[in-house]
Amino acid sequence: TLEYEQNPTETNHLNNALGIASNQGPGYGGLSDDQFNDLLWSDFLSSYTYESYQGVYDGSGSLSDGISAVNEGVGIINYTGHSGPTGWGNGAPLSVADVNNLTNTDKLPFIFTVGCNPGQFNDYTECFCESWMWATDNEGNPTGAVGHLGSTISQSWEPPMHGQWAMNSILTESYESNVSRSYGGI
């Protein structure tokens, strides 16, 4: 993470945001998951340093859409939907195997997952959050993500969305008292 923050080899992707979500709800503010991801874009990311946004949602998106977006390069991924220890369940339902085959070398996003158990490391050789952190290309160069925030347990629907909203507000310096200049500061 320190090398990535101090000496990034690729930077064009950092202004791209990706939202992956179900179309289920209601959750935060009575919104469905995809509407909530659109809110994160319109309320925070679009007025910060992010220039483009792609939403990959149930009903209009696919696994290949999500993989293509990640491989092309994104700086942040907000996922809101069902998940488990080995993958996401909605929008672009990536699995551990999909993450281990990504080709986004040196274009590593930070990921906020609102879903059950993606970080359940204690019962799996490689849980979904870990797969993002450990992924490499054929030459051993990092792929996957620079950081992934995800639950280790089954969780309720709406309260974690409040956390995702708050993390995006901190990342985009929307509250003066919560300014962070590094991934570690988030």
Question: Language model features by range: what are they?
Answer:
Residues T1-I186:
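Cysteine-dependent hydrolase recognition
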